[in-house]
């Protein structure tokens, strides 16, 4: 036994931080699948089958939100508890959670563990990582707690004290982690998400704010806390906030115009309801996975536009996915510099390094390649779906969004396996999988 433990320890010590991160996520997914496959996890007391359990666990850990069965009507309280725990671990990153336990038992964080935290949080240097992790954990508790408190003002009167509190906590965590899992199937039918609350200001705005805060990233949140004035924020925070709010505003306007008279989506709502629903849908496209209108009923041009926004996704070091807002911002500035024939690429009078530009281009091209490859594969495994439906499900998986227009529950076995792989790739990061990081190696 000692020899086996020693061999495993030696093997782990030889691994790169990125490799350990990938394996760590895979192990958590496997444990989650085993727990969800137990009869105690379902309401009918029967095992769901390992494939669907694995699909759900992958979606939860990768904070995606694509589901094979309705969360509220199929899973028991135990099953729902497992799912939300997996979401919290996946949203914060397993190294952040590991650091939490290390801090609780007052264990010293060594250099190798700091490298793992650095990789998990996508930070440039090692200084202040443990302190940053503490801030992340405290900020998460504060934001999710406040969100749950606000949601409880609606859910407790509607569902009673115990169920209302549980629903508030579940949806606050799911929203902040940009997961998109919901328990509203008992209210408005399976797979209905938050459509019942399309006109509810409290639910819509609270969930939207949680999604935005989870999507802009912890470094930006901490920068906002430290510096009350926008002018004092660092360059990264300014770029993230500007890009995020431009995309949200543009997305809201686009959805409002295209769906304004669609009787199956915005057409039945008053003007205020149209604005609220358009805003929420634009926000949730930032990799959250909730919806307050029927996505399958949206016009094709709206769905195509949503694919673009989902592909862009959230910001670095956040709970969201996608190729990241900073990647798109960097590429736009690069194109602008090329058109104006400028030698340097600048933002806020600061020069963007060539390494950053290359990394952004690499992430973007890998994202496009995964999307095209995924669309082709799923169109072969599930030929009954249209190309637009396939593309929507694939980008939703790769960008860990979780929005669906009806495809996920009806995928074939092969289709589900490939979608799981795309969710996993989207969560651990395409650069982590495909590119080595020689600058991170400590000799």
Specify the residue positions occupied by each region the protein language model found.
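Membrane-proximal intracellular helices of multi-pass ion channels
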Residues: 1-443
